[in-house]
Amino acid sequence: MAAKVNDGRETLRLRVLKRAAHVYWRFSRGMTLGVRGVVLDDGGRVFLVRHTYTPGWHFPGGGVEVGETALTALTRELAEEARVEITGGPVLHGIFLNRAASQRDHVLAYVVRDFRVLEVKRPDGEIAEAGFFPLDRLPETTTRATRARLDEILSGRPPPPVW
């Protein structure tokens, strides 16, 4: 079950900040890099988040900061967005161009099977809802890309180059 929050003003503010950040990154960086964690438990469930600033259900994740490794960013983002601690080595599923953000954004998707849930993720200004969902009963608004990555991982098919 996922916890919910709904604050229209906060959602608008975060959307504006997200857009401003992408404009800034476009001019200040040659490329942006993000990570996503495909957190799969032994019960056949995946952890998904619904952000306050963009529609649909996604894997938890975010940007790699200057001076940070991708695995450090993944560890930080999973702790922040999912309250999940990685206890074993994540496996890189693929590196993708994410055209939804810009022509400069790349995403590293990691499969995380060894983890510990620190606490139930509560809604905040960034995450409206979060939780584990059975793979055969994903939320209706789970994004196309999220469903595609799950299909690739579960079937063993190689990932495409574009998110």
Where are these regions (language model features)?
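Acidic, metal-coordinating catalytic segment for phosphate/diphosphate chemistry
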Residues: A2-R36
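Short, well-ordered beta-strand micro-motif
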Residues: V39, A109-R113, G131-P134
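Conserved Nudix-box catalytic region and its N-terminal flanking loop in Nudix hydrolases
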Residues: D41-E81
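Nudix hydrolase/Nudix homology domain
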Residues: G56, G125-W163
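A short coil-to-beta-strand element that immediately follows conserved catalytic motifs
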Residues: E85-G94
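Active-site-adjacent beta-strand/loop module that shapes the phosphate/pyrophosphate-binding cleft
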Residues: F96-E119, T146, I153, R157
